[in-house]
C-alpha cells in the first residue's frame, strides 16, 4: 500500500497549501521520494529553496531536515501550532536540523543570513533538543550561539543559550527590530549565558536568569520616546533632566554621547544586577550599580555623574573596568587622589518605575 500513499515523483502548484505544518501561499513544490528521502524544491511567499527530509526509524525525532534556502519568512501565526504542542507527549520529538537561510524574516523582522544545526538527544528523565550552532549575520551585527531546549519528567521545559553578539552598528541593529532613533552608531560586543522556562521562541521574563558582559564604543543615545526600548531609556538617564534642575542637564537631554560603555551584570528570575556599569563621554563619566526588575519595569540604582572631569580623574575613570571594582572603591580612590572632585561629583538614588522614576540626590561619596 505504501507505494500508493507516497509518490516517487510529485509536482504541486497551488494558491494555498499546508506543508510541514506551515501554511504556504502561491506555492509550487516539485520533489521526489525514494528510500526514505524526500527531496523537494519549494517556491512560495514563505519558503524559497531546497529541502531534504530524511525519514527516521519510527518517530519524528529520528529524522533529519536539511535545507538550503534563499528566503524563509516565519509568521507569528505559524508558531501557534508549535505552542499548541506543549501539552502533548511528543513536544520534544523535533527532528535534527541543518538549515542555512540567506534571508530570514522572523515575525516581520529581517534577521539576515541564518545557520542552525541541532539534533534531538534522549536521556534518562527526558529529552534535549541540542542547538549545536546558531549563527545570524546581517550588516549590523553577527550572533553566534549554542544551547539546548530540555524537557524533563512532568513536561518541565527549559531553554539555555550561550551567545556572543558582535555589534557593528547598535543604532541600526535596534532599528532592525523596530526601535528606531534610540542610539546613533555604536560598535562592540555583548556575550553571556541565559536561560528561561519554556520554549526557545517564547521568552519567559519571570524565570529569565544568566549573566552578561557588554562593551560598546563610539555612539550616542538619542532623545527618544521613553516608551520605546524602555530599558535603554533607564541606562541613558534621559529621565534626569526632566526631574532635576542640573547644571549638566544638556548632557543627557540632547542625548548622551559616549566613547565607551562597559558593564557586567547577573540576571536572576527577571531581575538584573550590576556593580560596574560605566559610560565614558567627552562631557561626563557616568557609573551605576544596583538592580533593574525587568518583570515590573522598575529599578533601584545608585548613579554617579562626574561632568567634565580633568585629566587626573579621567585616568582613574577609564581604569574603572575591572569587574571586581565597584563604584564605592572607585570614588574612594578618586577622592583620595583628587579631593576637589568631590565637589563636582553628583550622586543619585533612582527608584520607582521606568516611566516615572523617583530621583533623589545624595551626598557625594556616601551613596546615601
Protein language model features and the residues they cover:
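Small-residue helix/turn framework positions
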Residues: 6-23, 30, 39-84, 88-110, ...
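C-terminal low-complexity, glycine/proline- and small-hydrophobic-enriched intrinsically disordered tails
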Residues: 347-353, 358-361
Amino acid at each position: 500500500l505504501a507505494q500508493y500513499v507516497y509518490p516517487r515523483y510529485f509536482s504541486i502548484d497551488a494558491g494555498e497549501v499546508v506543508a510541514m505544518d506551515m501554511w504556504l501561499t502561491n506555492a509550487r513544490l516539485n520533489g521526489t521520494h525514494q528510500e526514505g528521502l524526500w527531496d523537494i524544491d519549494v517556491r512560495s511567499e514563505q519558503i524559497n529553496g531546497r529541502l531534504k527530509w530524511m525519514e527516521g526509524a519510527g518517530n519524528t525525532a529520528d529524522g533529519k531536515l536539511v535545507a538550503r534556502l534563499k528566503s524563509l519568512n516565519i509568521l507569528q501565526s505559524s508558531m501557534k501550532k508549535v505552542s499548541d504542542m506543549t501539552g502533548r507527549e511528543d513536544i520534544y520529538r523535533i527532528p535534527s536540523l541543518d538549515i542555512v537561510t540567506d534571508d530570514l524574516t522572523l515575525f516581520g523582522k529581517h534577521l539576515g543570513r541564518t545557520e542552525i544545526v541541532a539534533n534531538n538527544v534522549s536521556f534518562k528523565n527526558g529529552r534535549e533538543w541540542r542547538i549545536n550552532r546558531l549563527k545570524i549575520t546581517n550588516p549590523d551585527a553577527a550572533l553566534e550561539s549554542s544551547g539546548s531546549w530540555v524537557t524533563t519528567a512532568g513536561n518541565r521545559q527549559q531553554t539555555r543559550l550561550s551567545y556572543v553578539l558582535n555589534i557593528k552598528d547598535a543604532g541600526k541593529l535596534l532599528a532592525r527590530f523596530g526601535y528606531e532613533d534610540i542610539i546613533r552608531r555604536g560598535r562592540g560586543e555583548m556575550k553571556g549565558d541565559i536561560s528561561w522556562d519554556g520554549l526557545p521562541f517564547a521568552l519567559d521574563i519571570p524565570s529569565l536568569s544568566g549573566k552578561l558582559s557588554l562593551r560598546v564604543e563610539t555612539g550616542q543615545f538619542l532623545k527618544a520616546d521613553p516608551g520605546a526600548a524602555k530599558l535603554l531609556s533607564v541606562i541613558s538617564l534621559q529621565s534626569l533632566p526632566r526631574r532635576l534642575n542640573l547644571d549638566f542637564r544638556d548632557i543627557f537631554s540632547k542625548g548622551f554621547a559616549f566613547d565607551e560603555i562597559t558593564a557586567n551584570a547577573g540576571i536572576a528570575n527577571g531581575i538584573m544586577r550590576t556593580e560596574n556599569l560605566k559610560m565614558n563621554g567627552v562631557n561626563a563619566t557616568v557609573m551605576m550599580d544596583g538592580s533593574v526588575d525587568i518583570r515590573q519595569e522598575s529599578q533601584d540604582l545608585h548613579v554617579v555623574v562626574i561632568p567634565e572631569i580633568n585629566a587626573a580623574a579621567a585616568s582613574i575613570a577609564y581604569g574603572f573596568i575591572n569587574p571586581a571594582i565597584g563604584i564605592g572603591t572607585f570614588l574612594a580612590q578618586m577622592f583620595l587622589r583628587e579631593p576637589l572632585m568631590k565637589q563636582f561629583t553628583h550622586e543619585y538614588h533612582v527608584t520607582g518605575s521606568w516611566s516615572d522614576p523617583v530621583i533623589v540626590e545624595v551626598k557625594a561619596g556616601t551613596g546615601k
